[in-house]
Amino acid sequence: MAHLVYFSSVSENTHRFVQKLARASEARGEGPCPAIRIPLRGDIEVDTPYVLIVPTYGGGHPVPGKAGGYVPKQVVKFLNNENNRSLIRGVIAAGNTNFGAEYCYAGKVISAKCDVPYLYRFELMGTAEDVEQVLDGLDEFWKDTPWRQPRQLQNQ
C-alpha cells in the first residue's frame, strides 16, 4: 500500500475514514496503510509520493471577502510547499451530499490545480463499501501508476 496524506478537522470524519482503511488493510493481510495527517496548526513536509484524502469545506461557499472555500486552508498551505506538491499522485475527497453540486468539490479543485487524477469521493466518514473500493482502487492505481511524476513536472 502506498502512502496517504490526509487532513481532518476537529470533526475527525476524515481521520475515522483513514482509520477504517488501516484496519481493513490489516484484516486483508496487506500490512499497514501508511498515513500522515496534515496538522491543524504547523507545517509538515513529505518525502514520498502519496494520495491526498481531503474533506470539502462549507458547502464550497466562500467566506465573504475571501476567495475559495472548498479546500481547507491547511491543505492549501501544505500544497503550496513545492516539495509536497511535487509528490502528490492523486486525490480522494470527502464531503456531504447536502452540498448538492458542490459535494466533494475540494477533490475536483485539487485535481485540476495539481494535475492529478480525482480517484474517489465518499460521504462523511465513508461506508464499509467505500473502504473496500478505495483499498482496491489504490492497489490498482499504484500498479498502473508507480511513483510517476505529475504531468506538470514531466516536461520541466
Curated annotation (Swiss-Prot):
GO molecular function, one term: FMN binding
A Pfam family assignment: Flavodoxin_NdrI
SUPFAM superfamilies to which the protein is assigned, alphabetical: Flavoproteins
Highest taxon in the source lineage: Bacteria
Gene Ontology process terms (BP): protein modification process
Free-text function comment from the UniProt entry: Probably involved in ribonucleotide reductase function.
Family affiliation: Belongs to the NrdI family.
NCBIfam families (UniProt xref): nrdI
Protein name as annotated: Protein NrdI
Organism listed in the record: Mycobacteroides abscessus (strain ATCC 19977 / DSM 44196 / CCUG 20993 / CIP 104536 / JCM 13569 / NCTC 13031 / TMC 1543 / L948) (Mycobacterium abscessus)
Phylogenetic lineage: Bacteria, Bacillati, Actinomycetota, Actinomycetes, Mycobacteriales
Name of the coding gene: nrdI
